[in-house]
Amino acid sequence: MAKQTLGSLLSSGFDLAGKRVLVRADFNVPLDAQGNITDDTRIRAALPTVQALTQAGAKVILTSHLGRPVKKDKETGAVKVAREGNSLAPVATRLSQLLGQPVAFAPDCIGPEAEAVVNRLENGQVALLENVRFYPEEEDNDPEFARKLASLADLFVNDAFGSAHRAHASTAGVTAYLQPAVAGYLVERELQFLSGAIEDPRRPLAAIIGGSKVSTKIGVIERLLEKVDKLLLGGGMIFTFYQAQGIQTGKSLVETDKLDLARSLMEKAKERGVELLLPVDVVVADRFDKDAQAQTVSIHAIPEDWMGLDIGPESVKAFQSALQGCQTVVWNGPMGVFEFDRFALGTEAIARTLADLTQAGATTIIGGGDSVAAVEKVGLADKMTHISTGGGASLELLEGKVLPGIAALTEA
């Protein structure tokens, strides 16, 4: 299901000069209490697409969401929109600094105010529309709202991978009115790595899956068992697998309704000849707290009133040994409670191992979410082959799901 991309459009000689191009970006950035952007990674990620369009002489109209401004009253169904703290105005300022050119900010995303800003654009200039989620119709994928948004432009570029798993007006709905609808450079790169790594990898292929709950990773584990040579599990989910084998887990997090599932996943790994590795030792704590008492124990010796919060040093060694020689490694989810420094050692060790593998020529893909934060925390983000910008979108793509924002694009 190959899709048209901005790269293929430009290389085919398509003339973008003077064309109004609606670009759906993901500018859902964190802001502090004063409205300052605390992390501009997502803005920087959109730069290659924006710069390619300005250089081609297009009139660039950027759109995005920020936060969750729409609040629905459960009792009455009444809708309130919280504009305070959710405006994209700070993004326009930062984008202008990064691009080295003015970015016109429209105080609305549809209607006369948006039209006035777009109409003033010259070739190679950039405008940013206000938060599309100020309209509840955005998340409802309302056709009339999508039509109004689309009426501002001549063609559509989706570069918001982080929102590609949502069928919203600005990610999917506008494609009914704007053709061609193509993938931007960021989306193209995400698809290339996250789909390519699973469908056509250099082998051996290993996946490392962490995180606190099996329930959130069922789909991805099931699919990976059909594709990988090795599967390494860490994070809070491991205790459900231990209890499924009759191992006592103390007060560790266990999803008792997923014990049968854990057994069936272990069985499936065996049937498929996948090497499934679980930690052999864990760092346990007497309570869930950064200052808790901690000790490292074998998985067969977890004290009754203690809880596991990280993988232990022997597990790190076993994981490092299993990863040696792997040509492709996909990682999603931390090995422990990495927000607490003393329970972050397992996650940090795996991050360093992947950085070394990258240096040795392996393809390493950090599949979104908390594992990205963990890699950034140890300053190794630039040492990986690819860091995904998606959370839920990365996970759904790894699960093999069709993402609505991608499905809606023009076929190649």
UniProtKB/Swiss-Prot annotation:
SUPFAM superfamilies: Phosphoglycerate kinase. PROSITE patterns: PGLYCERATE_KINASE (PS00111). ATP binds at K217, G308, E339, G368, G369, D370, S371. The keyword Cytoplasm applies. Coiled coil: none annotated. Its EC number is 2.7.2.3. One of its GO terms (cellular component) is cytosol. It is found in: Cytoplasm. One of its GO terms (biological process) is gluconeogenesis. It catalyses: (2R)-3-phosphoglycerate + ATP = (2R)-3-phospho-glyceroyl phosphate + ADP. One of its GO terms (molecular function) is phosphoglycerate kinase activity. Substrate binds at D26, F27, N28, R42, H65, L66, G67, R68, R133, R166. CDD domains: Phosphoglycerate_kinase. Keywords: ATP-binding, Cytoplasm, Glycolysis, Kinase, Nucleotide-binding, Transferase. Pathway: Carbohydrate degradation; glycolysis; pyruvate from D-glyceraldehyde 3-phosphate: step 2/5. InterPro entries: Phosphoglycerate_kinase (IPR001576), Phosphoglycerate_kinase_CS (IPR015911), Phosphoglycerate_kinase_N (IPR015824), Phosphoglycerate_kinase_sf (IPR036043). HAMAP family: Phosphoglyc_kinase. Belongs to the phosphoglycerate kinase family. PANTHER family: PHOSPHOGLYCERATE KINASE (PTHR11406), PHOSPHOGLYCERATE KINASE 1, CHLOROPLASTIC-RELATED (PTHR11406:SF23). Monomer. This is Phosphoglycerate kinase. It comes from Synechococcus sp. (strain JA-2-3B'a(2-13)).
